[in-house]
């Protein structure tokens, strides 16, 4: 897992969801690819995707329910999960989570 990014553009305006309980900033790379770096406060959330995503949990703990799985899975800092394009996934955030989301394709 990369610890830092170089030669990137950061969009200052925050992406805000669920009454500001989930926030992130967009990072744009020289090749045009994007990631978001964010924080999720404890709570339950459901997200939809346009592109496939790789969600890295940097710190904290959450449970994820993915469309291709039949049960909730617990993830902690240092772990990640993949989300298919054009799908929905649910999260139960048990403690504040620091995350990095990479958009694929």
Curated annotation (Swiss-Prot):
Family: Belongs to the nucleoside phosphorylase PpnP family.
Pfam family, one: Ppnp
Record gene name: ppnP
The organism of origin for this protein: Wolinella succinogenes (strain ATCC 29543 / DSM 1740 / CCUG 13145 / JCM 31913 / LMG 7466 / NCTC 11488 / FDC 602W) (Vibrio succinogenes)
Annotated Gene Ontology cellular component terms: cytosol
InterPro entries noted in UniProt: Ppnp, RmlC-like_jellyroll, RmlC_Cupin_sf
Catalytic class of the enzyme: transferase
Function: Catalyzes the phosphorolysis of diverse nucleosides, yielding D-ribose 1-phosphate and the respective free bases. Can use uridine, adenosine, guanosine, cytidine, thymidine, inosine and xanthosine as substrates. Also catalyzes the reverse reactions.
Record keywords, A-Z: Glycosyltransferase, Transferase
EC number: 2.4.2.1, 2.4.2.2
Catalytic activity: a purine D-ribonucleoside + phosphate = a purine nucleobase + alpha-D-ribose 1-phosphate; adenosine + phosphate = alpha-D-ribose 1-phosphate + adenine; cytidine + phosphate = cytosine + alpha-D-ribose 1-phosphate; guanosine + phosphate = alpha-D-ribose 1-phosphate + guanine
SUPFAM superfamilies: RmlC-like cupins
GO MF: guanosine phosphorylase activity; purine-nucleoside phosphorylase activity; thymidine phosphorylase activity; uridine phosphorylase activity
Protein name: Pyrimidine/purine nucleoside phosphorylase
Superkingdom of origin: Bacteria
């Amino acid at each position: 897992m990369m610890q830092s990014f170089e030669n990137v553009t950061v969009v200052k305006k925050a992406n805000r969801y669920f009454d500001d309980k989930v926030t992130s900033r967009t990072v744009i790379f020289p090749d045009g690819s994007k990631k978001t770096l964010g924080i999720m406060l404890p709570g339950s959330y459901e997200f939809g995707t346009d592109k496939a995503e790789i969600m890295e949990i940097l710190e904290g703990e959450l449970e994820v329910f993915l469309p291709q799985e039949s049960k909730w899975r617990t993830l902690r800092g240092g772990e990640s999960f993949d989300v298919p394009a054009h799908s929905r996934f649910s999260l139960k955030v048990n403690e504040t989570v620091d995350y990095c989301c990479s958009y694929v394709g």
